[in-house]
């Protein structure tokens, strides 16, 4: 199992993407072992120019990332589909940080270890720190390709991931309001995509 340290979207037969410096392409075995085939895969990826990390908790890593990426997608959908617009809306970035924290809390309650640790630590800091970090990051031009471009191209995928997450966690609307709002935005974005498809037929 693994996840790329890059984000982007397709344009016809071309894939446009940017590497994410803060997130190396991460791979791991389901049983947590650092097998020879895993090391061989990591070597191939490194030779292709990707930064690579090995994880002994890949399943936890993927569940953590699922909460993280669906929350960001929901926030982008609420901000006109733009990372730049999102960065300008302090209240939306604040809701994003709260939603991710709530998602991580729900995962922890379900026995999932939040991975990677540096991501867990960032969102464990006083809220002003991750809020400031994400306002700066989302304002960078690359964020439009890495996050917004991916979110717009993967609306169905994002909603499918939310549905899978709901089989793992059960957020309480009273204490996880921001997470529920972000996930509702993901559902709305996927529904609009299908409505457009039907109207074009």
Predicted segments, located by residue:
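Alpha-helical scaffold segments in soluble metabolic enzymes
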Residues: 40, 44, 66, 73, ...
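NAD(P)-dependent Rossmann-like dehydrogenase/reductase catalytic/cofactor-binding core
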Residues: 97, 101-201
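Inter-helical turn/loop segments and adjacent helix faces that build the functional surface
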Residues: 49-53, 82-90, 168-176
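Active-site-proximal catalytic alpha-helix in oxidoreductases
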Residues: 59-87, 91-104
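Helix-loop-beta segment of a Rossmann-like dinucleotide-binding subdomain
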Residues: 14-29, 77-88, 141-152
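Short, structured loop/turn "capping" segments at alpha-beta junctions
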Residues: 51-55, 78, 113-115
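Rossmann-fold dinucleotide-binding core
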Residues: 1-65
């Amino acid at each position: 199992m693994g996840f790329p340290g890059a984000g982007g979207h397709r344009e016809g037969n071309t894939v446009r993407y940017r590497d994410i410096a803060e997130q190396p392409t991460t791979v791991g075995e389901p049983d947590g072992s650092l097998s020879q085939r895993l090391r061989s895969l990591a070597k191939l990826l490194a030779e292709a120019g990707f930064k690579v990390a090995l994880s002994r908790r890949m399943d936890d890593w993927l569940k953590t990332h699922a909460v993280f990426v669906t929350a960001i997608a929901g926030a982008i959908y609420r901000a006109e589909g733009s990372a730049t617009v999102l960065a300008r809306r302090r209240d939306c970035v604040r809701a994003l940080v709260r939603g991710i924290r709530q998602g991580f809390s729900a995962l922890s309650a379900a026995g999932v270890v939040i991975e990677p640790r540096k991501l867990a630590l960032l969102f464990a800091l006083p809220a002003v720190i991750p809020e400031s970090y994400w306002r700066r990051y989302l304002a960078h031009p690359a964020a439009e390709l890495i996050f917004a471009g991916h979110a717009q191209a993967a609306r169905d995928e994002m909603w499918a991931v939310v549905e899978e997450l709901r089989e793992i966690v059960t957020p309480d609307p009273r204490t996880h309001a921001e997470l529920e709002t972000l996930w509702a935005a993901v559902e709305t974005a996927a529904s609009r995509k299908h409505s457009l498809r039907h109207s074009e037929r």
